[in-house]
Design a protein with these regions (language model features):
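Asp-based, Mg2+/Mn2+-dependent phosphohydrolase catalytic module
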Residues: 1-205
Length: 205
């Protein structure tokens, strides 16, 4: 979209036009790096006019997932059940939030926008049900995370410990350690702790 096209949208909105958007992704991953997404262009119009869009046809609304259930059902009268579906994506504030809003299990994949730090600090409405490095791990069962005591969480052979303002893990190259760290961080935040003040591990996955 060119500057002139953006300007024409702004002029129309200033004159009272209502507008809907396809999605609100601020960024999108491209071959050469991270590029501005539709949400960044929308924000330009909002900055110029002070007027928000009336709705989004895409995520984080769950309508896209609901429609997919109907399409997948084919000629059946009932859509595919939510329990048989999995919302998959690389963005917490679109893909995962849409799944949570719609009542779907969700899976965050680390090959796109989201990084381990964002996962550990995610508020409840942005937290995925599952975490994988890449889509090849869809073929693998994800181990459960368990609290072995008040400060230590385990996932398979990996552990995460949160004490004295520091979250540490057994192996920062292990996806199970990230899963354990997320469980520890989320529990801490849900119990009223300030996860922003906690020293978090640097993962290399």
């Amino acid at each position: 979209m060119t500057w002139q096209q953006m300007a024409e949208v702004s002029y129309a909105v200033e004159r009272g036009a209502l507008y809907l958007v396809t999605n609100r992704d601020l960024t999108i991953p491209r071959e050469l790096g991270i590029a501005p997404g539709c949400g960044s262009m929308i924000q330009t119009v909002i900055n110029a006019t002070g007027v928000e869009q009336i709705a989004s046809a895409g995520k984080p609304e769950s309508a896209m997932y609901d429609e997919a259930r109907l399409l997948a059902a084919g000629n059946e009268t009932e859509p595919v059940s939510r329990e048989s579906c999995l919302a998959i994506g690389d963005r917490l504030d679109t893909d995962i939030e849409a799944g949570n809003r719609g009542g779907y299990d969700s899976l965050a994949v680390l090959t796109g926008v989201t990084n381990p730090h964002e996962l550990m600090t995610a508020p409840a409405h942005l937290r995925p049900s599952y975490i994988v490095r890449d889509l090849r791990e869809l073929q693998e069962a994800q181990p459960s995370t368990d609290a072995s005591d008040g400060n230590v969480w385990t996932c398979a052979d990996a552990t995460a410990r949160l004490e004295d303002g520091s979250l540490t893990v057994s192996d920062a190259t292990d996806i199970n350690a990230l899963r354990a760290a997320c469980a520890a961080a989320w529990t801490y935040a849900d119990n009223g702790g300030d996860i922003g003040s906690v020293s978090l591990p640097e993962f290399s996955l």
